Amino acid sequence: MLLNCLCLKFLRLIEVRERGIYMTKRAVWAEIDLKALENNIRNIKSCIKNKAKWCAVVKADAYGHGAVAVARKAVEQGADYLAVAVISEAISLRQAGFTTPILILGTTPVEASADLVAYDITQAVYTIEQAKAISAEAVRQGRTAKIHMAVDTGMSRIGVRPEQAGDLAQALSTMPGIELEGMFSHFALADAKDKSFAYQQLEAFKLAISKVEAKGVNISIKHIANSAAILEMPEAHFDMVRAGIILYGLWPSDEVEHVIELQPIMELKAQIVYVKMLHPGESISYGCTFTAQRESRIGTLPMGYADGYTRMFTGKAQVDYQGKRAPIAGRICMDQCMVDLTDVPELQQGDVVTLYGSASLTMDEAASWLGTINYELPCMLNARVPRVYKG
């Protein structure tokens, strides 16, 4: 009886304290809060004007959060479209059972046109050559392929110039097997306090629309609003908006007003798998860049740059434990890194720390250590890091 009680107590301890390890068999994981995602979606939808449709941007594996789980929640909450960057992302969603329209915002090689048509994927188009390849495949397969014409209003990436949009739209609309369902552009500075350039882009997009309409072409879904524009540029909502970074509870920049409540949905966690004492004069990791100046308690985390916890965090990063900080010590290795636990004596082997994403160690702070943006950190995490979903 005593043995059974001890076993149950031990299992309960694992399940409660180390939920990620219990579910993934690895002592590092990214915990994704689906209830927070649902709350974010609800608040985002409250900002959308003119009964516009909304598109959930789930490219890059939903910014590292897991495309299937995020897309499923988005569709449950009424997403009209899903958006990705490359065809493999779109096909993965189709193979996972999604029937919601999927838009590829980036370029797809013409050689992959057969898959675009077969998987019913909407492609961004900005050249006649792309459209001809898709048209030929649609005719061959006896299907209709939807496309959205990309317009370059100032990003200078892909897209037709606004003054040429009418001619291209007219040509696309007459091709067999093609439905020119949408046209879109992308803001470069909607997340800045000074939105003068964003409004220049908005006017350029309106010019493109007028050129298209002058050719007698009707396009049902016009969209340019990204996350920042959803929050601060209601006049840019048109027929659909694209929610990206704000889905994940992160702000597009520190210049965007917090007009709604957003909750970050990812917390990167790791278990301390080993603790040892380091004596004065002893060093840690490659290059021996950290040398103990005192008796030091050093913990090892099974997380390294091969997981997406970049070596550039060396000498900058800290981990969080119940609001207390412990610094990374020495160079981050491919599969492990070390933490100086000396000033947090309660931290022991088996305890779980947060590398970023907690209320007291945010994604934004961790990104600032690298001189980058919050978007990049979750995108860096690769498939070796299990995603554990709650809520």
Predicted regions and their residues:
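Intrinsically disordered, low-complexity Ser/Thr/Pro-rich tracts
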Residues: 2-3, 59
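Active-site anion/phosphate-binding pocket segments in diverse small-molecule metabolic enzymes
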Residues: 24-38, 46, 53, 89, ...
